[in-house]
C-alpha cells in the first residue's frame, strides 16, 4: 500500500512539472510557490489528474479563488477550460494583441458582463464639444504616468467603473496642484440626482455632480466600499472642486488626442465585448464592438498615446486591478474611434 501511494505521489509530481511547463509557456502565471504541495488540494481531490486540472488548481491558488462545493469546482473548471481554449485559438490568429489567463478565467462572458460592465445612461456625447485647442506642440507620444499625476490602478469589484474613471481624471488634475486621491464611494452614494445610479453612471454626469455639490471628499476620509450606501459627504473633507466639465466632440479623436497630449488624462468610455476581459498585452482592436453612445458599457481613463509595431494606440488605465492586462493598463487602437473610445470623452477643470 505504501509503495502504491509513493508511486502515485511521484506520478503527480511528474505530471505537474510537465503540465505547468507547457502552461507557463502559453499562459504565464506568477505562482505563489512552485512546490507541488502548494496546489489547492480540494480542487485536485475533485478533478484528480485530468487534463488541465493542475492548470486550474494553480490558477485558483494564484488568484485566491474559493469554491463552496464539488459542483462549483467542476462548473468553474469547465468554464476555465473553455476560456483557455478561446485564449489559445485567439492567440494563434497573430493579432496585434494577445489574451491570457487572469482572474476572470473562471467566469462565463455573461457572468463577467453582468458583474463588471454597465450601460450608458445619458452619455456626454455631443455634436459640438467645448474643448478648446490651445497653442502648443503636440507630443509625438504621451504617458502621463511619467509626470507622476496618474494615481495607482484600483479594482472596482462589482461596482461601477464610472467612479474610478471620474476620480482618475480628478486625481490627475488634483495631483497637478497638490497630490492626493479622491473618494469613489462618495460618487456611488451621493450622485444619483445627476443621472448616476449607485454602481452605474458616467464621468460627465459625475463631474457635474462634483461641480454643483461643492467638491468631492478625499479617499482617506471617505473610503471605497464597492456597494451603494448612505451619502456621508462632509464639506470639511473636500479635496477638490470642479469649476467646469469639458466634453470632447463625439468621435473626434483629434480633440481627444489634443486634450490627452497637452492638458491631462481624460475620462473615456467604450464598449467591452467578449475577449477583452482576457486581454493581456498589445494594441487591442475589434470588428464587433460598437461606436455609438448607447453601445459603451465601461468607463476608463486615457493617460497617453503612442505607436507600437506601426499601430497608433491610446494608453488607457483600467479599474480591474493590477493582475489584469498590462499591470492594469491596456492599449487601444487610435484613429478609428475604436469601440467608441472618443464617443463619450470628458475631463474636469478643477480648483482646490
Swiss-Prot record:
GO terms for biological process: proteolysis; vanillin biosynthetic process. It is an enzyme of class 4 (lyase). Inhibited by ascorbate. InterPro entries: Papain-like_cys_pep_sf, Pept_asp_AS, Pept_his_AS, Peptidase_C1A, Peptidase_C1A_C, Peptidase_C1A_papain-like, Prot_inhib_I29. The keyword Glycoprotein applies. Its EC number is 4.1.2.66. It catalyses: (E)-4-coumarate + H2O = 4-hydroxybenzaldehyde + acetate. The active site is at residues 298, 318. Pfam families: Inhibitor_I29, Peptidase_C1. Mainly expressed in pods, but also present in stems, roots, leaves and embryos (at protein level). Keywords: Chloroplast, Disulfide bond, Glycoprotein, Lyase, Plastid, Transit peptide. One of its GO terms (cellular component) is chloroplast. Disulfide bonds join 159-199, 190-231, 289-339. Optimum pH is 8. Pathway: Aromatic compound metabolism; phenylpropanoid biosynthesis. Glycans are attached at residues 122, 247. It is found in: Plastid, Chloroplast. One of its GO terms (molecular function) is protein homodimerization activity. PROSITE patterns: THIOL_PROTEASE_ASN, THIOL_PROTEASE_HIS. Involved in the biosynthesis of vanillin (4-hydroxy-3-methoxy-benzaldehyde) and derivative natural products, key components of vanilla pods flavor. Catalyzes the conversion of (E)-4-coumarate to 4-hydroxybenzaldehyde, a vanillin precursor. Mediates the conversion of ferulic acid to 3-methoxy-4-hydroxybenzaldehyde with a very low efficiency. Cannot use cinnamic, caffeic, sinapic and o-coumaric acids as substrates. Belongs to the peptidase C1 family. Forms homodimers, homotrimers and homotetramers. This is 4-hydroxybenzaldehyde synthase, chloroplastic.
Amino acid at each position: 500500500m505504501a509503495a502504491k501511494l509513493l508511486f502515485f505521489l511521484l506520478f503527480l509530481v511528474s505530471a505537474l512539472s510537465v503540465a505547468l511547463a507547457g502552461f507557463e509557456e502559453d499562459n504565464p502565471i506568477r505562482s505563489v510557490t512552485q512546490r507541488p504541495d502548494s496546489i489547492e488540494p480540494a480542487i485536485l481531490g475533485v478533478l484528480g489528474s485530468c487534463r488541465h486540472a493542475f492548470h486550474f488548481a494553480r490558477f485558483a491558488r494564484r488568484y485566491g479563488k474559493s469554491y463552496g462545493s464539488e459542483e462549483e469546482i467542476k462548473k468553474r473548471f469547465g468554464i476555465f477550460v473553455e476560456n483557455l481554449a478561446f485564449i489559445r485559438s485567439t492567440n494563434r490568429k497573430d493579432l496585434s494583441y494577445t489574451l491570457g489567463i487572469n482572474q476572470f478565467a473562471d467566469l462565463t462572458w455573461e457572468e463577467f458582463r453582468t458583474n463588471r460592465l454597465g450601460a450608458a445612461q445619458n452619455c456626454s456625447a455631443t455634436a459640438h464639444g467645448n474643448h478648446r485647442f490651445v497653442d502648443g506642440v503636440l507630443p509625438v507620444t504621451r504617458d502621463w504616468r511619467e509626470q507622476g499625476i496618474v494615481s495607482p490602478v484600483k479594482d472596482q469589484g462589482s461596482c461601477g467603473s464610472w467612479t474610478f474613471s471620474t476620480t482618475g481624471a480628478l486625481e490627475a488634475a488634483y495631483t497637478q496642484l497638490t497630490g492626493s486621491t479622491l473618494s469613489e464611494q462618495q460618487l456611488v452614494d451621493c450622485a444619483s440626482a445627476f443621472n448616476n445610479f449607485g454602481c452605474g453612471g458616467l464621468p460627465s454626469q459625475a463631474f457635474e455632480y462634483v461641480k454643483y455639490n461643492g467638491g468631492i471628499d478625499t479617499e482617506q476620509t471617505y473610503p471605497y466600499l464597492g456597494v451603494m450606501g448612505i451619502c456621508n459627504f462632509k464639506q470639511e473633507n473636500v479635496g477638490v472642486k470642479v469649476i467646469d466639465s469639458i466634453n470632447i466632440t463625439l468621435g473626434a479623436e483629434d480633440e481627444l488626442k489634443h486634450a490627452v497630449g497637452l492638458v491631462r488624462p481624460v475620462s473615456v468610455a467604450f464598449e467591452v465585448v467578449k475577449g477583452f476581459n482576457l486581454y493581456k498585452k498589445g494594441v487591442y482592436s475589434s470588428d464587433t464592438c460598437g461606436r455609438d453612445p448607447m453601445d459603451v458599457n465601461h468607463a476608463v481613463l486615457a493617460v497617453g498615446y503612442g505607436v507600437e509595431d506601426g499601430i497608433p494606440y491610446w494608453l488607457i488605465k483600467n479599474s480591474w486591478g493590477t493582475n489584469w492586462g498590462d499591470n492594469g493598463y491596456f492599449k487601444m487602437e487610435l484613429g478609428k474611434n475604436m469601440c467608441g473610445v472618443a464617443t463619450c470623452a470628458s475631463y474636469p477643470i478643477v480648483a482646490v
